[in-house]
């Protein structure tokens, strides 16, 4: 139609300066994260609606589109946070928001979905992060399954930001993780041989491939872009 729905993350940290009434700015502790759903009329070029659809969240950094709605990722572990939330795009309230704990608790950055099998691919914004996927047991129950971390075949704890040769193709495998409510998934994965990435960022699924980038990866720490082919496991 003529209307576009934009799901806008609130990437705001826990402590921010806020205007307190008519007085001076002061530091106030609150939960300023979340998601706002905006409806834009392309033809008339005006904002039709703007409402918050996720509240009580913190530092919603990136996320990704999915068959079920917008997936919003928290990039913080403060106060028990660090989850992915499902925000339906067809609702203008917070009633149907869902925490996806099976996607793990970590410094989440972004996520994408392979619509062929509903596998989720997730990045983590840390200097010593892993690259993750969530494998549903069955396709129509996308949030029930197992969490895994990517490993390079034949390489234990491969350091991608200094050893990766862009001219080569690497065969990969996945190690299973014990998905508890702790910020230790990367340590679990690397103990089992998972590859190490430097500040995982955006992810996108296109033409049956997963593309993702790292902010400070590479020999000069100016970033890397990776392509993963699920069909070939490389």
Q: Predicted regions: what is each one?
A:
Residues 1-234:
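Sequence/structural signature of beta-propeller domains
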